[in-house]
Amino acid sequence: MSIIFPTYSEKKALSKSKQKKFCIWQIVINCERKRMRKLALSDEILLSVDKAARYIGGEINSVMKNLDGIDVRVAFCFPDVYEIGMSNLGMMLLYNMFNKRPDVWCERVYSPWLDLDKLMREQNIPLFALESQDPVRDFDFLCITLGYEMCYTNVLQTLDLSQIPLKAADRDESCPIVIGGGACAYNPEPLAAFFDLFYIGEGETVYDALFDAYKANKEAGGSREEFLLKAAQIPGIYVPAFYDVTYKEDGTIASFAPNRPGVPEKVQKQLIVDMDKGYCPIEKPVVPFIKATQDRVTLEIQRGCIRGCRFCQAGMIYRPLRERDVEELKESARAMLKNSGHEEISLSSLSSSDYTHLEELVNFLIDEFKSAGVNISLPSLRIDAFALD
């Protein structure tokens, strides 16, 4: 299909919404010409949906790899729209970490908006990853981050659009391994029927062991079930099919026991002990084509919290408190702002004012980036932690 772009005078006569669609189309054309990339969606679809830049990939700092050297393909899904998912720090940390491995290619997947969802179902278009535009069903892993319970219906949408059977028991050797992780994975049972395995804990710790086990099983010609048995022996991995769970009348768990030999009786959460050694800092954050919900660089200064508020799930599951080295944070801030062009940096933690070197770090950022006009955001501040100076 050939597209004839309107002249300047013709474009002025168009409505603002149509002008925006033509601008988005020009972005798509430029991506194809410069990168020679195929796109999963046709010209007609991209012109008909809202914010088509959500679906084309090719952003600055997104990771492209040659499939010839790739042993493990990972589709990493945030089950919400692009603008929200692109603001998620946990997903960006793991995307960066996974792609450090030369044998792994991690690509991003987000939930389409209602207009595209409808068209994909009507035209039988499977859900695809942004980088390669390949169908999610062709990957080795589909990792879905579970940040909050309100996204659970989107998890089912993701599986359905990917043309992957909803229930783990109905999947065969051709289906990717579906992994659940994130804060809500600490209570996995509500979604247990839909996931092949859950990772309980902080993602940086044992994914390397999981990928290595998958590679070894693949090279040995092992089956899907053989891999899941090996995965279940990795600390922090919970395979629902290998456990029998019974419930009380009020819906709480009555008993929890493994039904396979070699499977641990309890699954213990995994965490980084030393944030300076186990942490994989982001140097080149992906810069979205359209404005994200949090349009800034995010710098994680510490993990965990000393406060222990009983209403706060994150304060409980991410214990204990672990701080990052202030000099490492300074270098990370320089790299992220230089490589992204963002004009704001957020110092992220559950209670930023409790970071030991906060004053030193803030003063450094003010002095270092004053001429560039970079703003500093301090979320999660407690009113009782302020000093007069």
Protein language model features and the residues they cover:
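Polybasic, lysine-rich low-complexity intrinsically disordered segments
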Residues: 11-12, 20-21, 34
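Helix-enriched interaction subdomains in cytosolic or periplasmic regions
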Residues: 35-51, 101
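N-terminal [4Fe-4S]-dependent radical SAM core
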Residues: 45-75, 82-83, 240, 246-298
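Conserved SAM/AdoMet-binding glycine-rich loop
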Residues: 76-77, 335-389
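Glycine-rich beta-alpha loop elements in corrinoid/cobalamin-binding modules
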Residues: 111-258
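Iron-sulfur (Fe-S) cluster-binding segments and ferredoxin-like electron-carrier domains
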Residues: 312-328
